[in-house]
Amino acid sequence: MATSEAPLLKRTAATLSDDMAVNYKLLHSPKFRALVVENVLSVTAFAFMARQTESLAGPEMETLNNCGVNGCGFTSFYQFKGVVGVYAAFWVYTVLLIGLYLFSRGPPPGTEFVVHALFTLCMIAFVSLSVISCTSTVIESDYSVCKNAAYAKASLVFAALVVVLNCATCAFVFKQWRSLQFVGMPENFRPFGRHRHKHGHHAGDADDAIPTHP
């Protein structure tokens, strides 16, 4: 009984070991390295903005007075709070994604592209609004909201770098998804999907069948 169980235990342990093995080859992938850089830049972006608890001028003179002599913090501006929220959420996402990739459990290209694209759109929106707010002048023509807010200005620089890297990552993931014939996307939404259907494409054709899962 014991002798028959020993090989089974060894096979089970070997299977678990293979499943939990770290994919070290992935460390040399440009896509993985870009993801790590995005992770570092995103945590830097929201950390700097979150540290801006004073020195911001209000969009109106009354706001400046209400914040006192030390000025406003980032919480007085929904744009800056949006930067903190979006980039903090993206940092958590990149941490999870890095962990999945290390153990060869990455999401399908379609899922990764959609999530990255949505994050990028939110980033572009809040960064653009923050830059507009940051450069707005109050009281005097040469006194901007972020004139004395070094952390906020640094945060927006790092945030913009993340947007650039995200756009490059989206392009790379989209190419991967396209090479898999947009697997997971409904037929009617695929490029040329309706055209192929009109010309006699059948789901039962083995040569033309598109898998629904990677």
Swiss-Prot record:
The keyword Iron does not apply. The keyword Cell membrane applies. Its main location: membrane. Residues 1-82, 134-153 are cytoplasmic. Residues 194-214 are annotated as: Disordered. It is found in: Cell membrane. Residues 104-112, 175-214 are extracellular. Keywords: Cell membrane, Membrane, Transmembrane, Transmembrane helix. It is a multi-pass membrane protein. GO terms for cellular component: plasma membrane. The chain crosses the membrane at residues 83-103, 113-133, 154-174. Homodimer and heterodimers. Belongs to the Casparian strip membrane proteins (CASP) family. This is CASP-like protein 0U1. It comes from Ostreococcus tauri. The lineage of its organism: Eukaryota, Viridiplantae, Chlorophyta, Mamiellophyceae, Mamiellales.
